[in-house]
Amino acid sequence: SITAAILLVFVLLMLLFSNRSGDFSAMEAQDGVLDATSADFSSAVYEIDGEWTFYPEVLGSGAELDAAKPGERDESIPYGSYRLKIHAQPKQYLTLGGYSFDYSTRVLVNGSEVLEIGKVGASAAESEPRIDYMLIPIYTGEDGTVEVVCQYANFVHREGGGLTQMHLSTAENIDHMRRSRNLYSLVLGGSLCLFGMYFLLFAVFQGEIKYVFLAVICALLGLRDQNFYVLHLLPANYNWAVAYRFLVLMITLQPCFLLLLLQSLYEKLAKPIVVRCYAVLYAVLAAAHFILPTQDIAPLSRIGYYLSMPFFLYLVVQLIRRFWRIRRFEWDDVLVLLGYLLLF
């Protein structure tokens, strides 16, 4: 059917664009030091692997970090500093690009602040959460040595503040990479949202609940990409706390609507009382996203997956029984099950 075919198409579209990682050269930091003296930044973008030096519960740079004791990264640590010393050819203008830390970031190059996303502080009252893409300007100077310090604060939830993937090259190359990624994100997110509007119109005219589920799934898959949802869709002065709650809610709801769609595609697959109980439990879980403090919201998405597992196994058993009873496996079934196999 057209429903099964489009389900498979947008799943393939999502996989196609979400797996476009780019063509990068690898460069590994050792003990917080990156040797880039042999790099040709004019022709390549370098993906920085390895470890930066981490200083737990220290917001400083230069001599302050020299006097501090490095430590191991722990997600329970609410704030800290990452330091990377770059050795490159002298007198080069470079750009370090990457997404900001969860959930506020301040960057210093050779002790001078070059950008701050949100507000970094040693307490929740002193901090303001915000995320964005970072473009960090670097000049290697006479000796080719640069110190980059990324300070973060995370009083939003008990996980986060981990080192993000960084890329180093000329400003032109980093800008080209970012534009390419934005294009993938906009095409994928925009296409899924358009699919969602299409299915919503279909639901209005056809009066079938499965099209409502398809519309919601398309929107959830499109908006769960933070690059599309936060950086391109929301206005610059958005309320961060509300946006964060909706982001976690969209991740939480995804397995629910995928399973509700599956049971709606096959008539009488699940008993109505089972579907109602599952829907009520998930409605309570969804409401909790706007009741609990932000520190307790992130685990709700995992709870949603645990809550969905019994219903998923129930539907698998019912599908096996159905196909065994009718002894027929049609082309529509192949498309639907292939789409779900790719999603899971």
Where are these regions (language model features)?
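Surface-exposed coil/turn segments at beta-strand junctions on protein surfaces, enriched
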Residues: 75-77, 89-91, 129, 140-143
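Juxtamembrane segments at transmembrane-helix boundaries
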Residues: 186-344
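Sequence/structural signature of beta-propeller blade repeats across diverse families
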Residues: 19-30, 63-74, 117-125, 204-207, ...
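Beta-strand-rich ligand-recognition modules
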Residues: 28-34, 109-147, 152-163
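Extended carbohydrate-recognition surfaces in non-catalytic/accessory domains of CAZymes
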Residues: 1-90
